[in-house]
């Protein structure tokens, strides 16, 4: 770590180390002038020799400073100390959503359905705000959601987010397939940038995991997991857990349709259905089988997928170039 407890970044005193990723270190700090506790995100300046990483940092800073919503972690300040840039974020007293999921599962055997619905509504509200402001998160997962002791959720970590109209970043030998395999939309796996519907897909995967206790597609390795998103349909939640309402199952699986045009076009529509489950008629939802994405199920067909994968909790990015022989995985 570049900083120790007691170090100062301008008026901010480092209190503790919160984490270290592939791209930045995160610290708990205190504003010596106001006494306010904050989070300092300090990117490794050596990485800025790569123009792509520098642009990604600038983009995250721009995104974070533009946000003002109770369901999204806020940026408070930013600066540069001895040629090292840093971002000051709202300190959220609590933990990440993954830890809360484990705790509730240990207590109740499964996350209560009313909690599943509440979390879904909170996350949908945050995404609705982000999308209305031209921001696509592109890496929504429990590790990137903060949870307070009072049950409030805040979406965080915009290292892979996309601003509407932002210039496409090009990574050497890589496409824009960015995300985490368990939650990546099929179009992201295929190297597309993704749009609001990619976030809706990830929201659906999270909702499925909340209700079922497991993600819908989990292979022996992350290549097999991604192949599942491209070729398989999730088992109905009502088969995984008998107390899941059929209406909730329909909403979640519509959000997770393989092809973007088959999903909700707006997260606001998914939120509305979630808030009015008693009015949702599952028989009106088209949840039938979908063809594999791009015909990838053909046993003799091999396709090259070059992806950018962030698969370690707390890491901003992990760059991986791969060639997947899908016929071996299916």
Regions found by a protein language model. Give the residues of each.
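Conserved N-lobe ATP-binding subsite of Hanks-type protein kinase domains
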Residues: 25
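Conserved short submotifs of the Hanks-type protein kinase catalytic core
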Residues: 82-96, 100
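Activation segment signature within eukaryotic-like protein kinase domains
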Residues: 119-120
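Protein kinase catalytic-loop region centered on the HRD/HxD motif
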Residues: 125-135
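C-terminal lobe helix-coil module of Hanks-type protein kinase domains
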Residues: 180-285
